[in-house]
From Swiss-Prot:
Keywords, alphabetical: Cell projection, Cilium, Flagellum, Phosphoprotein, Ubl conjugation
Modifications the protein undergoes after translation, according to the UniProt entry: Sumoylated, sumoylation decreases upon spermatozoa capacitation conditions.
Protein family (similarity comment): Belongs to the ropporin family.
Positions of the UniProt region annotated as Interaction with RHPN1: 209-212
Entry keyword Acetylation: no
Domain commentary: The RIIa domain mediates interaction with AKAP3.
Cellular component GO terms held in the UniProt record: cytoplasm; cytosol; sperm cytoplasmic droplet; sperm principal piece
Domain RIIa: from-to ranges: 12-43
Further details from the record: 'Ropporin' comes from the Japanese word 'oppo' which means 'tail'.
Name of the featured protein: Ropporin-1
Modified sites of kind Phosphoserine: S56
Any GO BP: flagellated sperm motility
Subunit: Homodimer. Interacts with AKAP3. May interact with SPA17. Interacts with RHPN1. Interacts with FSCB; the interaction increases upon spermatozoa capacitation conditions. Interacts with CFAP61.
Native source species: Mus musculus (Mouse)
Length: 212
């Protein structure tokens, strides 16, 4: 095989392009991610606007149920506390609730999930299709995960919140890890009480907590 001294140059803007691609994929929820990716990068190479679907265009088909926090809570209850769930089993649960197959496939593709799925990560990405911002997404996740039945504000263990916020921020790609660390340190030291729980209001109503 002939040798060559030619080097492959990676453009410095590639990491940002990939971060934006991930966000646009979550927003668009294409049924065929590979085909959509080809169209996406093809449009960018031609200097055209990539085929990103806006939230207002995401109208569910009449034969599918619309994804809601309530349905995600039902799904979470059926996962029954497991941290890992098999893809086929989760797909069947999703199908029983009559939720859109293309959305399931999109979450699977964006999360790069295989046969064994980390449930909290899947749930976080599913919630991100409903939440406009990271704070809104985390609010929905808290509502889904909260097991309080006394009518109080939704709350979850801070350790769970820490895991979810770190993961969602990583997928989003626009928030530095140092900012995430600062916010988590502040919340842990100044907000979290002896019970170790975080309430939705702790990160949506506190002016010193800016998750984005």
């Amino acid at each position: 095989m002939p040798q060559t001294d030619k080097q492959v140059c990676i453009p410095p803007e590639l990491p940002e392009l990939l971060k934006q691609f991930t966000k646009d994929a979550i927003r668009t929820q294409p049924p065929d991610l590979i085909q959509w990716a080809a169209e996406y990068f093809g449009a960018m190479s031609r200097g055209e606007i990539p085929p990103v679907r806006e939230r207002s265009e995401q109208i569910p088909l009449s034969n599918w149920a619309e994804l809601t926090p309530e349905l995600l809570k039902v799904l979470h209850s059926r996962v029954a506390g497991r941290l890992i769930i098999h893809a086929d089993e989760l797909a069947q649960m999703w199908k029983v609730l009559n939720l859109p197959t293309d959305l399931f496939n999109s979450v699977m593709n964006v999360g790069r999930f295989t046969e064994e799925i980390e449930w909290l990560k899947f749930l976080a990405l599913a919630c991100s299709s409903l939440g406009v911002t990271i704070a809104k997404t985390l609010k929905i996740v808290c509502e889904v995960l909260s097991s309080d039945h006394d009518g109080g504000p939704p709350r979850i263990p801070f350790s769970t919140f820490q895991f979810l916020y770190t993961y969602i921020a990583e997928v989003d790609g626009e928030i530095s890890s140092s900012h995430v660390s600062r916010m988590l340190n502040y919340i842990e030291q100044e907000v979290i009480g002896p019970d170790g729980l975080i309430k939705v209001n702790d990160f949506t109503q506190n002016p010193r907590v800016r998750l984005e």
